[in-house]
Amino acid sequence: MKLVLKGHDERYVVEQGMLNLFPGERPVYEPIGPEDDTWARVSLREEADGCTVEVELSWRGTAATHRLDAPMTGDEFQREGLRRRAIGRCFFLAAHGVTGTAPPWGMLTGVRPVKLPTREMAAGATPEQARSSLERDCYVSPERAELAVDCAQASLAALRSLAPGEVSLYVGIPFCPTRCAYCSFVSADVGRTLKLLEPYLDALLEEIDALGRILERTGKGLRTFYMGGGTPTTLSAVQLDRLLTRCREVLPLEGCTEYTVEAGRPDTIDRAKLEVLKGHGVGRISINP
């Protein structure tokens, strides 16, 4: 799909919307010609108190246009979020006008839709208000909205169970062997970034050392440990052992109630890696289909 952006450079938001609504398409940033039948022109005009987004879209010759006005307040960080939400909503509505269909999760992309109802309920909204917000503002189906709110309630209950001096740790491994067909992320596979893997691991170990010193100085304990990605099992068994050995040496893992590593795709897992995980006390793994 040819994409033309006017008045902004929010490529990520537009590409996420394209992948969500038109999963077979890939972004091409070139001028739109009269012979092209699959394209989107996303325009933004921003003022002090709001913005106007217009999306003109053609998919296989069927065209639709949607225009959306959205208020904008707050600091630049807050305005950036509102701007991206407006672009995402407008693109979704234009695409819906072309296809006549909507994914169960509506305009939401990525892997953390539960953050929205969790944030709302933490601020005082009822579960019903959070559910209605997902359906009204993000076009999520009633079934998925109910699922998200149920998960948000479980998340808030888990947060309430944390003691004041406890923290949860996420260790990110942002590499994948190849791109999965179901993945909505705009990313590169490890074949193109393999040279960065070892330097990244070196830097990660330095950061873990620094974190260990902070936890020791502040007297905080570690409640949960989760290694995700990407695909952590893109690392070799030797690299995994090196990483988890350092974690054991400098982090207070003995108090963890959950020690999880996202094993990712079955083709990245072998016996040697599983033995490394088990040997370091990992009690839970997740495997993608």
Ranges and model annotations:
Residues 2, 18, 24-78, 87:
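Short, well-ordered secondary-structure micro-motifs within conserved domains or adaptor modules
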Residues 76-102:
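Accessory, often N-terminal, substrate/partner-engagement and coupling regions
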Residues 81, 193-201, 233, 237:
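Flexible, glycine- and charge-enriched loops at secondary-structure boundaries
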Residues 99-102, 122-169, 218-219:
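N-terminal [4Fe-4S]-dependent radical SAM core
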Residues 166-199:
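Canonical Radical SAM [4Fe-4S] cluster-binding loop centered on the CxxxCxxC motif
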Residues 205-289:
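Conserved SAM/AdoMet-binding glycine-rich loop
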